[in-house]
């Protein structure tokens, strides 16, 4: 589907021994280290979602201003204007979530909840914005002649890798419950 230039392949290690001095963490600590790395990489994935969404909005806006239907550019139709407005406000909200998650990471502050929020929200925004862009393009948006269909395919995979939308919601909920527990007792 999306991101065809980025191949993903499994790497399998069988009967591999790692000398103690080459361990990245203590024995049995690898999973924790890998999960901590996601707190740093998820905002980076989220910023990619924001970029996809912004590109889709720019293309859809330009197209809506040029495409004439019933004697006027489709950008003059209120339904299209509402779609463009919703796309813009959601992109800005996603961008701000990404900035917060990245800022926390830069400060060395635990950001599991914020990283998951940024990744989940930005990925969902990218999917919705690209779907709206395809809708604004109409039948042409579904073809490979216009880049919005590729952006939509690329947006879909971001909802899946580095943790699905459902996993992000679990991370968010668990962090909220931990925070509430700490403040109540």
Predicted regions located by residue number:
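Alpha-helical interface subdomain recognition
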Residues: 10-15, 20, 26-29, 35-185
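A short local loop/turn or secondary-structure capping micro-motif enriched for an aromatic residue
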Residues: 3, 20-21
